[in-house]
């Protein structure tokens, strides 16, 4: 077994995706072959789901720590692994396919080959998934609420919990466009990142910093454009993505509808006859 297959299987096992063991025909392996060198794949196989410094990761490997650190930084910029910065110290960990690698590849998702791999593997993941960690949430009409009593599903709670925000292009609609199937909904600066994800995406060149005011404006405009706000994971302390999705472009919204897995909580939407 080579390191590209080993890496795909490791991510599958760590994040408990009930997929068959990978081989060279699988889209995830093809994606890694396109994105990583042999040495990068070997180093990535030494990571797990916890952030570790280069010195820890390379212990027992026949590679200099400085060289490994450069390779790790490069993989983080590519979007294959997550980089965490604490002061002047960097640490690295593996990410699940989604949310994680899928979104982090937005800078290269316009490449038709990469777009095809992402769509194919998304279909594979959906085929074995009972539910996605996503929830559709409403935008409060007054987003600056800062009280403890705010409903779990009100998006202002998530914004209140963080001070760092970023925006990036919609990867799903970018992929659609790369396939010649653009749906017409906006692509530019429609996905919002908060907290540690905002820091990672900005630092590695995948997104740009945004103010709270701009985030609120984007959310309001998304509603005006008929988009749906999706957030995952659902645990509010870990929720770091807010996607503004359309049913004609969002792969996960389309797949969630297919397997009836969009999560609902306290609120039920009804159409008033008035």
Question: What is each of the regions a protein language model found here?
Answer:
Residues 61-77:
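Short amphipathic alpha-helical interaction segments
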Residues 116-206, 210, 231-235:
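Long, Pro/Ser/Thr-rich low-complexity/intrinsically disordered regulatory tracts in eukaryotic proteins
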Residues 34-40:
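Short helix-coil-helix linker/hinge
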Residues 76-87:
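A short, conserved structural fragment
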Residues 88-127:
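Short, amphipathic alpha-helical interaction segments positioned at domain boundaries
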Residues 50-61:
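Short acidic, hydrophobic short linear motifs in intrinsically disordered regions
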Residues 1-31, 83, 90-94:
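N-terminal leader segment of winged-helix/HTH proteins
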Residues 92, 232-237, 260-274:
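Ferredoxin-like iron-sulfur electron-transfer modules
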């Amino acid at each position: 077994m080579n390191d590209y297959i080993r890496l795909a299987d490791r991510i599958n096992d760590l994040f408990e995706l009930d997929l068959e063991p990978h081989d060279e025909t699988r889209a995830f392996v093809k994606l890694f072959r396109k994105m990583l060198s042999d040495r990068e794949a070997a180093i990535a196989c030494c990571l797990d789901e916890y952030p570790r410094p280069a010195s820890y990761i390379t212990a027992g490997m026949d590679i200099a720590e400085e060289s490994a650190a450069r390779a790790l930084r490069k993989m983080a910029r590519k979007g294959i692994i997550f980089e965490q910065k604490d002061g002047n110290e960097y640490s690295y960990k593996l990410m699940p396919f989604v949310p994680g690698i899928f979104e982090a590849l937005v800078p290269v998702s316009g490449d038709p080959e990469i777009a095809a791999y992402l769509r194919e593997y998304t279909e594979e993941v959906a085929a074995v998934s009972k539910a996605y960690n996503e929830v559709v949430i409403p935008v409060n009409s007054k987003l600056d609420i800062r009280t403890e009593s705010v409903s779990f599903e009100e998006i202002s709670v998530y914004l209140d919990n963080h001070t760092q925000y970023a925006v990036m292009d919609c990867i799903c609609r970018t992929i659609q466009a790369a396939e010649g199937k653009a749906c017409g909904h906006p692509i530019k600066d429609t996905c919002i990142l908060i907290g540690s994800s905002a820091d990672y995406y900005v630092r590695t060149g995948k997104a740009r910093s945004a103010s709270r005011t701009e985030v609120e404006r984007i959310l309001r405009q998304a509603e005006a454009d008929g988009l749906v706000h999706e957030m995952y994971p659902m645990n509010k302390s870990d929720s770091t993505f807010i996607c503004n999705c359309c049913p004609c472009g969002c792969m996960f919204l389309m797949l969630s509808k297919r397997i009836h897995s969009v999560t609902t909580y306290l609120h039920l939407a009804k159409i008033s006859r008035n």
